[in-house]
């Protein structure tokens, strides 16, 4: 009897812990709303990419997001960052995605994961590893056996890294995106039948599910591109949509006549190209649109809330028929509410003042800026002549110029 009493006491002691764990992890889409812990909870998110910020600053930037009134952080996952060579994975230092997610959870924030496999993001090759182009029979972003073999390996490996951080297991990850703006690709690749596009999109969603991702899934596209981008079983969200009526109309069309309604990319700034003017977006207009969303039960994700820096050779490029190739800057400041250096901007204050009027939780003050250092004058000394060094290397001879990929050169420079 005494033994049974001890067991009963232990069970009673454990039950509150289990209940806390379950309530802590509860996030669902129900009755046209997002629910967290049984309560309707708008997702007020900001996009911040772990790889564009030194890991020593992650917590500070997350605290700045909280100080703005946000409750969620969204991030892309960059496949080529983590698999620089086939089968060789790296999740250390600034690439430690799990640590970034844990830090967000410690700061009381929800996390939205956007693993692609294609991510755009003005990132080199849209996040695809360069070596995919050397795989025989490979056709990227298609219902192609070789391509899907590698996407499965990536998604499975990603799950091993962050799967236990889903809210279904007590972690902060509440949503995962399927593919990325796929409707844009469908619109551009009319040479591929729509049914094949949809088959590929569905297979990426299935790979996420098969790996073990079991939080709500979603897609993100321009509202006029849902036909190609939406996929059954995933919440369709709109990018850059300011018209509330149109947002609700198109989401209803592809989501059983109900929400929740979310703008997965709400642009408080814009990207920058070399040799072009730096784009600037006014604070007052962004504040008004933020209030409009809050008044109409529309969740949103600021893309970007803090841009950071394209380190190394990670910056990508766009293409414009009038300008040809448009390489992105090393800076990914994005004219975001939090500057590249991690400082408060007038846009930050304007958004914070709006959000504070609508949320029921206390919005903390923004943390103090990180201290800066004064760098003394640096005298450069010639060590070697780069071109002279290159000329001493054994050349590769070919009848026609070879690509970097053909030379197994992922990044850097090639002298032709």
Q: Where are these predicted regions, by residue range?
A:
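Carbohydrate-binding surfaces of carbohydrate-active enzymes
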Residues: 148-162, 169-178, 183-184, 188, ...
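Conserved residues at the C-terminal ends of beta-strands
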Residues: 47-49, 76, 179, 306
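Bacterial Sec-dependent N-terminal signal peptides
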Residues: 1-23
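Aromatic-lined substrate-binding rim segments of carbohydrate-active enzymes
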Residues: 58-126, 130-131, 205-210
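Substrate-binding/catalytic cleft of secreted carbohydrate-active enzymes
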Residues: 113, 117-150, 156-302
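N-terminal carbohydrate-binding accessory modules
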Residues: 20-72, 102
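Soluble non-cytosolic domains of exported or imported proteins
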Residues: 56, 91, 95, 145-149, ...
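Aromatic- and acidic-residue-enriched carbohydrate-binding clefts of CAZyme catalytic domains
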Residues: 39, 76-88, 93, 121-146, ...
């Amino acid at each position: 009897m005494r033994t049974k009493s001890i067991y009963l006491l232990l069970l009673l002691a454990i039950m509150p812990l289990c209940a806390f764990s379950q309530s802590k992890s509860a996030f669902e889409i129900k009755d046209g709303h997002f629910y967290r812990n049984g309560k309707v909870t708008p997702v007020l998110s900001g996009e911040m990419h772990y790889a564009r910020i030194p890991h020593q600053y992650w917590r500070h930037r997350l605290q700045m997001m909280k100080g703005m009134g946000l409750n969620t952080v969204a991030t892309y996952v960059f496949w080529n960052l983590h698999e620089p060579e086939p089968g060789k994975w790296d999740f250390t230092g600034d690439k430690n995605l799990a640590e970034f997610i844990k830090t967000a959870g410690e700061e009381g924030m929800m996390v939205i994961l956007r693993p692609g496999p294609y991510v755009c993001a003005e990132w080199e090759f849209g996040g695809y590893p360069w070596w995919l182009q050397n795989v025989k029979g490979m056709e990227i972003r298609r219902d192609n056996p070789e391509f899907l073999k590698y996407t499965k390996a990536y998604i499975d490996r990603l799950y091993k890294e962050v799967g236990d951080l889903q809210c279904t297991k007590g972690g902060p990850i509440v949503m995962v995106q399927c593919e990325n703006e796929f409707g844009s690709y469908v619109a551009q690749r009319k040479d591929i039948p729509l049914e094949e596009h949809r088959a590929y999109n569905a297979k990426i969603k299935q790979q996420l599910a098969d790996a073990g991702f079991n939080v709500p899934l979603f897609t993100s596209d321009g509202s006029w591109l849902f036909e190609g981008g939406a996929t059954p079983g995933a919440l369709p969200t709109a990018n850059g949509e300011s018209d509330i009526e149109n947002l609700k109309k198109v989401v209803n069309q592809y989501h059983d006549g109900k929400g929740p309604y979310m703008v997965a990319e709400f642009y408080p700034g814009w990207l920058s190209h070399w040799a072009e003017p730096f784009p600037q977006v006014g604070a007052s207009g962004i504040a008004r649109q933020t209030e409009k969303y809050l008044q109409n039960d529309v969740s949103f994700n600021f893309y970007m809330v803090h841009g950071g820096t394209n380190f190394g050779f990670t910056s990508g490029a766009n293409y414009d028929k009038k300008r040809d190739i448009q390489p992105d800057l090393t800076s990914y400041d994005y004219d975001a509410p939090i500057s590249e250096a991690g400082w408060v901007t007038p846009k930050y204050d304007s958004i914070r003042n709006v959000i504070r009027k609508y949320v029921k939780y206390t919005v903390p003050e923004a943390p103090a800026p990180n201290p800066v250092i004064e760098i003394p004058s640096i005298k450069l000394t010639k060590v070697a002549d780069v071109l002279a060094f290159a000329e001493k290397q054994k050349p590769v001879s070919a009848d026609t110029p070879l690509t970097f990929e053909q030379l197994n050169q992922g990044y850097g420079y090639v002298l032709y």
